[in-house]
UniProtKB/Swiss-Prot annotation:
Protein known as: S-adenosylmethionine:tRNA ribosyltransferase-isomerase
Organism ancestry: Bacteria, Bacillati, Cyanobacteriota, Cyanophyceae, Synechococcales
Xref: NCBIfam families: PRK00147.1, queA
One Pfam family, short name: Queuosine_synth
Catalytic activity from the UniProt record: 7-aminomethyl-7-carbaguanosine(34) in tRNA + S-adenosyl-L-methionine = epoxyqueuosine(34) in tRNA + adenine + L-methionine + 2 H(+)
EC number: 2.4.99.17
Predominant location: cytoplasm
GO terms for MF: S-adenosylmethionine:tRNA ribosyltransferase-isomerase activity
InterPro entries reported for this sequence: QueA, QueA_dom1, QueA_dom2, QueA_sf
Transferase in keyword set: yes
Source organism per UniProt: Synechococcus sp. (strain CC9605)
Gene: queA
Compartment(s): Cytoplasm
Length: 366
């Protein structure tokens, strides 16, 4: 019988000392600490501890790493309203003909018809067109040639800032590189797929030399990253959709995999499983929105193992990881990580969930 607490949001809360929230990345990337989840039935105190570099020992020839190659836009803009007040826009997604959905702060002071000037630039003006009730954001007119992520990226690189999460209290020029994965390629995200931040060029080369294969999906991390789960009854949970691209090459790599399919980060899980669910549980190429909810009781169709960071309390990402190893085990491991001074969230340390420690009843069918 499933535990009813697994479907209550309050069951995914945990106390986190503020000093455990990482404010800066470690160098080199692969020197972040790595908590290796022990097998089911063994206490959390039996978890092994090392560094991300130890994936060279944990992964095997023939394994397939699936990474997210999205690139974070410099999507945070300081703007001045026509009255002179300073506001902020977070550029989220295109809505056609140079119109973009943005989060505004302070939102109440940004009204339809307002003319905005990008702070530090006198030549670029924006117009607030309308409020967006679904997101609480604003529809903003940019220059008409800013049609999509590729065409707006040049403008944002000149005048924007990296949109670090609100719990990171720093502004450092190095974030423009450090808050990107080494394989970031396709612009469109407003937050990084943070498990991928741990991979250095040296680690990637070592894995390739060992015979570990790499496949790239794209999931543009969007607005939902900043929105907490507010539904106590998780049977009624609905999540934001995010745009994904699972190419024919990725599907072929999964089908040809001689070892284990390992997702790097929860975004890779969501993309692979979302593509499979769109085709009745069978992985096929897919491009489009995914709003899949993964929580305890979910039966995985593709993913066998996971490298992931430590996630916020009561978040959808915590639900996803719990689906692999169980809620109680995950929270015990988080307690162990806090006791051992692990660093949490985007710039923090990582957890390795090998396929052999995943709950047997949720593993993909042969």
């Amino acid at each position: 019988m499933p535990d009813p607490r697994d479907l209550q949001l309050s069951s995914y809360d945990y106390p986190l000392p503020p000093e455990r929230i990482a404010q800066a990345p470690v160098e080199p990337r692969h020197s972040a600490r790595l908590l290796m989840v022990p097998p089911q039935g063994e206490p959390s105190t039996d978890a092994a501890h090392g560094q991300v570099w130890d994936l060279l020992e944990q992964l095997q020839p023939g394994d397939l790493l699936v990474v997210n190659d999205t690139r974070v836009l410099k999507a945070r803009l300081a703007v001045r309203r026509s009255g002179g007040g300073l506001s902020e826009l977070l550029v989220l997604e295109p809505r056609g003909e140079g119109r973009w959905l943005c989060l505004a702060r302070p939102a109440k002071r940004m009204r339809p018809g307002d003319i905005l000037t990008i702070d530090g630039s006198t030549s670029i003006s924006l117009t607030v067109l309308a409020e967006d009730p679904a997101s609480g954001g604003r529809l903003v007119q940019f220059p008409s040639d800013c049609r999509d992520a590729e065409t707006i990226e040049g403008l944002l690189n000149d005048v924007g800032e990296v949109p670090l999460p609100p719990y990171i209290e720093r502004h450092d020029p190095s974030d423009s590189q450090r808050y990107q994965t080494r394989y970031a390629d396709r612009p469109g995200a407003v937050a990084a797929p943070t498990a991928g931040l741990h991979f250095s060029d040296e680690l990637l080369a070592g894995l390739q030399q060992k015979g570990v294969d790499l496949a790239r999906i794209t999931l543009h991390v969007g607005l939902g990253t900043f929105r907490p789960v507010e539904t106590e009854d998780l049977t009624a949970l609905e999540l934001h959709s995010e745009w994904v691209d699972v190419s024919p090459a990725v599907v072929e790599a999964v089908q040809a995999c001689r070892g284990r399919v390992i997702a790097v980060g929860t975004t890779s899980v969501r993309a692979l499983e979302g593509a499979a669910q769109a085709h009745g549980g069978v992985l096929k190429p897919y491009t489009g929105p995914v709003d899949l909810v993964i929580q305890p009781g979910y039966r995985f169709a593709v993913v066998q193992g996971l490298l992931t960071n430590f996630h916020l309390p009561k978040s959808s990402l915590l639900l996803l990881v719990s689906a692999l190893i169980g809620r109680e085990k995950l929270l015990e491991l988080y307690h162990e990580a806090i006791e051992r001074d692990y660093r949490f969230f985007s710039y923090g340390d990582a957890m390795w969930i090998a396929p052999e420690v995943v709950l047997p009843e949720v593993q993909p069918r042969p």
